[in-house]
């Protein structure tokens, strides 16, 4: 932004990721609210009246975390579920039906099997937004929010002599293929010997660990991150869905 050049001996890339928006929804971006920054949150708060109605698209775990919070403070939430439902968890069809039932019991309205073909401004006297379904019909709400997974923010790294797949490829010590560059957080894929592939590790507990390990290794350490994952969606003692990705300690 400032067109500055800063030299470095070692670089940590922790640029994170932004919300992924499927191609079929991109033309409607101006009519949707994001949650990628503090400014986005302020705009969302301003757009939403008391006991307002939020329509969520997709249904990844970030969105569901917000959904349960909105319901808890008195708002109505309708989720138009897509293929990103419960992402990044991989949930089988039988378990998905069970988790959807629990989600509805938590107060979230879930719409299944509908393809969104348009988002429009509401007509006079109606809520501010209308989501239109293929084959007819739709739903009105005060705000529309897409939660369709994450896309690593790494375009600026092209040409930096690092290997890139969907994210920056790093070893378990979080070093890229460039000996001067490390990466941590949603921007990187870590080599997992257990899975014999590069994996993303989402959630605050993973990201916090990555930051600590990257700092240690950039100052001479050789610490490796644990690449074993047991991050399953589950139903807690209160009978609600819960996830390790919702751990913020």
Kindly label every feature range from the protein language model.
Residues 28-51, 138-213:
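FAD-site-proximal beta/loop scaffold in flavoenzymes
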